Each structure stands twice: as C-alpha cells, then as structure tokens.
Amino acid sequence: MTLVHLRAMNSENQKPLAFRLRMVHENGTQACPLGRQINFQVIRTSGVGGQTLINGKVYHWIDGSCEIPLEPGRYHLELEAGIRFVPIRRTIEVKPGQAALRFNLEPCNFRWKDWIQADARCHSMSPAAALLEGSAGGLNIVHLLAREFHADVNQTADISGLLE
C-alpha cells in the first residue's frame, strides 16, 4: 500500500478546491483518507466530522488535498465540488509506487453562476466542520444554529495539533 497525495484544483486558475470524495477499489474496498473514517455514527445530533453518508454511500469532505493509502489497481472515483463545477465520476488506475493524483475540475457554465448558495439551517456540527462541508459543497454561506447540550466530542475534522 502506498500513501498517495490527492489534490483537486479549479481548472481556470489552478487554485485548490475543497471537495467531496469517494474512491472504491475494484475489489469493493473503500479507500479512506488519513484522518477520516469509514464507519461512523449517523444519528440525530451527532456530528460526523469530515465524512458523510449519502444514499448509503460514505463520502469524505476534503479541504483541497489529502493523503490516502491506496493499493495498486483500478478505482471508481467520485469527486465533486458543489454545483459550480462539473463532477468527476470515472474509473482510474493507480500504479505501484504512484505518489500523486491530480484532478482539475471544470467550472459549469450555467445561468445561476452568480447566485449566492447557502444552507440556512445546520445543526450539530462545529464551525470548522461547517466551513469544510460548506466549502466542499460549493456554498457561500452556512448558517450554523447553535444550541446547548452535552455530548461527547468525536469530530476528527476539528483536531489540529496535540491534545493536552
């Protein structure tokens, strides 16, 4: 298994883009970026950090690039950066010893490109997770609703540095 650096960029300006990622090996094993999980809680009021479950499939929110351990072989790749960019859904080949994967996302040319996109009601996530998911989903605004309750912190996307 090789640790591969994966990056997605805007094809117009070559700047990194936050994105949603799903990679499944031809043997059915899902690839998981470092710092993310394949199995996580999906119950109401439980923040899930840098991953999400959509129609029974696990996706990972990535801030522009990630390190991902990959076996050589063919993978089905799904890479999306909101509705302003054409998603990439295709089969790719990872060769033995390959160190990097780079993807350019093409901007969509559609009538709503100058509109503001927002999620007006987000619960049970930290500001860092809301920023990551909103950016990867192509949102301009995320309205994070705060409330007070006591719960265990399990947000792997929020950990930066050493815990003391």
Predicted region positions:
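Extracellular Ig-like/FN3 beta-sandwich strand-entry sites
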Residues: M1, P72-R74, Q98
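Short, ordered, surface-exposed loop/turn motifs in non-cytosolic proteins
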Residues: E12-G50, L139
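Catalytic cores of extracellular degradative/oxidative enzymes
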Residues: D114-E164
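Short, surface-exposed beta-strand/beta-hairpin micro-motifs centered on an aromatic residue
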Residues: V58, D63-L70
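Extracellular beta-sheet/turn segments enriched in Thr/Pro/Gly and aliphatic residues
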Residues: I92-F110
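A short, solvent-exposed beta-strand micro-motif common in secreted/extracellular proteins
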Residues: G50-V58, P72-G82
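A short, amphipathic beta-strand motif
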Residues: T2-E12, L21-M23, Y75, F103
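Short acidic/polar inter-strand loop motif in beta-rich domains
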Residues: G82-I88
